[in-house]
Structure formats: structure tokens, C-alpha cells
């Protein structure tokens, strides 16, 4: 469907380096990365807004690298939606169809049809300035999909929405995909969007696409320490391994594999279990630890822990914190499964 081959670009403060990946028909492919990684520049190269210094963009077997945007049959929704403020919702949605010189009757049919699917029939007479963020997003998606593009490009599509609206949109996006069968390339910094919507994900760091794969596989098996840190492995521990035992600052940790020499391991905070008594679980690593700090994070709490010469971070709910009576200075038991450990 879409194939990006060895694309590189120096553009302002961004540098893309040898980007290659493919998007399959009717797939929702996520490019996931922090701000400044070059995600938007990559989208604009695919859309034809920016020319690559090197590499090719292949769409349905055709090299479109030199094609202008209007010849690529793509639809691009930027982060600010780019609705025409002087036009009604109806005319915004109809804009691309009019450029294609479609009959007035066919335009009317298509606009009303897509408006019904996206639930915006009642907004067709209004101007963008009177719409909420969620309504503007629906109009932008309708305008993009009504032309039946080969590929829909989405730049941080939920960044301007409140939490509840974003949650509703992600649920509805799955329904729209099933009903309309479109193919999409979606860039975001949000893990939630990647996990909820992505069929596959590519992790982009510092202008390079460093890992591509199934969403679950990428999140559970980051290819290196840099990807692991970005994906939430906050606990990175360095030590010396002998067989399946790692010794780090006097603390011995059982590993999932046998290795030798100096290595680093990563453990997610959410994979660490806290208790006030020793627990009988399948966890093969259990330690006594001192609580050295507590940070409020909305519904979750980050508990900072000291085990001998190493520190760990664990996530628990606020209710669990209260129930366990955990407070700074208290001693608790820390445990985690060997399967939760990623060895680098």
C-alpha cells in the first residue's frame, strides 16, 4: 500500500535518517515518538508538502516522490485541523469533491453520507468558529475521508481534545475504520493511542525509526535501552551477571536468561508489586525496601524505593497506598517476576 524507502531529510532543527517502513491496506499504523523526533516532518514528506533529500515514497507500487500533494490521493489532517473559517461545515467537507468536478448531486450525497457516519449532520450549516474541539475534529476527518483517499495521514489527532472527548473519539475511530475500511498513518507521542488504535507501531527517536512491529511485541520487548526508557521502563539497573543472577550494588536479581558480564536490565514500575508482608507468588525476586519518596500522579502514585545500593520506582493506586499504609520511611516488601525483566 504505502512503502517508505530510506528517506532522509535535514529540515530546520529536524534530521530524518534512513527511514524505511510500509503500511498495509486497511491498517492503522502508528508512528510513536517524543516531541521533536521528526514525526510531523515525515508525514509532510509522505504528503508531498516537503521533499526528501534522499529516499522514495511508493504508493500502490507507484513512485510518487516527485508528485505534488494533489496528485497523491492522500488526505492529511494537521494538528490544528486547518478548517476554512469562512466556509460552513458543509462547504468544508465538500471542498475536495468540488476540486474533482463532481456533480452537485453527487457532492450532496457524499457529504450527507459521511456526515451521518461521523454524527455531524446537525452541524452542516455552522461555521468552524462555533464548533467545539471534538466537533472540529469530526469535520476534519469527514473532509478527509469524503474524497476516499488511498491513505489518511493523522498528525497528533487527539492532542487538542479533553480526556473524555479523546476517549470517546478513540472508540469511535475503531467503528469508523470498520465501516469505511480506510488505511491510516497516525503520528503521536501517546502510548494510549498507540495501544488502543495501532495494528503496528514504529518507534521514532531522534529522527530515526528504531523499532517497528506488533504493538504488544514492541511494548514488551523494546529493541534497546533507548526505546525501553521511552516506552516506560523507568527502572534501569546496571550490574554484573553470572548465569541467571545479576549482582548490582550488593543486590542479587534473578534474570529470565543466562548471560555473562556487565549488563543492564529494565523493569516497568507497574510490574513491581508492593506489600507489607512477604508474598507467595510466582515472582522470583523479592526484597525488603525502604520507601524514600511518594509522588502523586492523578489516579496513580509513584513510590520511590531503596533496596541496598539500588533504587526502584513502583506504581500503585492511591487506594492501595492508603490500604497498605505506605508512607515515606516505612519498610515494605518489593517483588517482581523474572518475566517482567528486559535484559539489554
From Swiss-Prot:
Binding positions (ATP): 33-40
Domain Mop: 280-344
Subcellular location: Cell membrane
Domain of life of the organism encoding this protein: Archaea
CDD domains listed in its UniProt record: ABC_ModC_like (cd03299)
This protein's UniProt keywords: ATP-binding, Cell membrane, Membrane, Molybdenum, Nucleotide-binding, Translocase, Transport
GO biological process: molybdate ion transport
UniProt membrane topology term: Peripheral membrane protein
PROSITE patterns noted in UniProt: ABC_TRANSPORTER_1, ABC_TRANSPORTER_2, MOP
The protein's enzyme class: translocase
UniProt cross-references to SUPFAM superfamilies, sorted A to Z: MOP-like (SSF50331), P-loop containing nucleoside triphosphate hydrolases (SSF52540)
EC number: 7.3.2.6
Residue span(s) of domain ABC transporter: 2-231
InterPro entries named among the record's database cross-references: AAA+_ATPase (IPR003593), ABC_SmlMolc_Importer (IPR050093), ABC_transporter-like_ATP-bd (IPR003439), ABC_transporter-like_CS (IPR017871), Mo/tungstate-bd_C_term_dom (IPR008995), Molybdate/tungstate_ABC-ATPase (IPR053428), Mop_domain (IPR004606), P-loop_NTPase (IPR027417)
GO cellular component: plasma membrane
Any one Gene Ontology molecular-function term assigned to this protein's record: ATP binding
Role this protein plays: Part of the ABC transporter complex WtpABC involved in molybdate/tungstate import. Responsible for energy coupling to the transport system.
Assembly and binders: The complex is composed of two ATP-binding proteins (WtpC), two transmembrane proteins (WtpB) and a solute-binding protein (WtpA).
Family: Belongs to the ABC transporter superfamily. Sulfate/tungstate importer (TC 3.A.1.6) family.
NCBIfam families to which the protein is assigned, alphabetical: Mop, tungstate_WtpC
Protein name: Molybdate/tungstate import ATP-binding protein WtpC
Organism name: Pyrococcus abyssi (strain GE5 / Orsay)
Taxonomic lineage from the root: Archaea, Methanobacteriati, Methanobacteriota, Thermococci, Thermococcales
Amino acid at each position: 500500500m504505502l512503502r517508505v524507502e530510506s528517506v532522509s531529510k535535514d529540515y530546520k532543527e529536524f534530521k530524518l535518517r534512513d527511514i524505511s517502513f510500509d503500511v498495509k491496506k486497511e491498517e492503522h499504523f502508528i508512528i510513536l515518538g517524543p516531541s521533536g523526533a521528526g514525526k510531523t516532518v515525515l508525514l509532510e514528506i509522505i504528503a508531498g508538502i516537503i521533499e526528501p533529500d534522499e529516499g522514495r515514497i511508493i504508493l500502490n507500487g507507484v513512485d510518487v516522490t516527485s508528485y505534488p500533494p494533489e496528485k497523491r490521493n492522500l488526505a492529511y489532517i494537521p494538528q490544528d485541523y486547518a478548517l476554512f473559517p469562512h466556509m460552513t461545515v458543509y462547504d468544508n467537507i465538500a471542498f475536495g469533491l468540488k476540486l474533482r468536478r463532481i456533480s452537485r448531486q453527487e457532492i450532496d450525497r457524499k457529504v450527507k453520507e459521511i456526515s451521518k457516519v461521523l454524527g455531524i449532520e446537525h452541524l452542516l450549516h455552522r461555521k468552524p468558529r462555533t464548533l467545539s474541539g471534538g466537533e472540529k475534529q469530526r469535520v476534519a476527518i469527514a473532509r478527509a475521508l469524503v474524497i476516499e483517499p488511498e491513505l489518511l495521514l493523522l498528525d497528533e489527532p487527539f492532542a487538542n481534545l479533553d480526556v473524555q472527548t479523546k476517549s470517546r473519539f478513540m472508540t469511535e475511530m475503531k467503528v469508523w475504520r470498520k465501516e469505511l475500511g480506510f488505511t491510516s498513518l497516525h503520528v503521536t507521542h501517546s502510548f494510549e493511542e498507540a495501544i488502543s488504535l495501532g495494528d503496528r507501531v514504529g518507534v521514532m527517536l531522534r529522527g530515526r525509526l528504531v523499532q517497528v512491529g506488533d504493538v504488544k511485541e514492541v511494548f514488551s520487548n523494546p529493541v534497546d535501552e533507548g526505546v525501553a526508557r521511552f516506552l516506560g521502563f523507568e527502572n534501569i539497573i546496571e550490574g554484573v551477571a553470572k548465569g541467571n543472577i545479576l549482582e548490582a550494588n550488593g543486590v542479587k536479581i534473578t534474570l529470565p536468561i543466562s548471560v555473562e558480564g556487565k549488563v543492564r536490565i529494565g523493569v516497568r514500575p507497574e510490574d513491581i508489586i508492593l506489600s507489607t508482608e512477604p508474598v507467595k507468588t510466582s515472582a522470583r525476586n523479592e526484597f525488603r525496601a525502604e520507601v524514600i519518596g511518594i509522588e502523586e500522579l492523578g489516579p496513580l502514585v509513584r513510590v520511590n524505593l531503596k533496596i541496598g545500593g539500588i533504587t526502584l520506582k513502583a506504581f500503585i493506586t492511591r487506594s492501595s497506598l492508603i490500604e497498605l499504609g505506605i508512607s515515606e520511611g516505612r519498610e515494605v516488601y518489593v517483588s517482581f517476576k523474572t518475566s517482567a525483566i528486559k535484559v539489554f
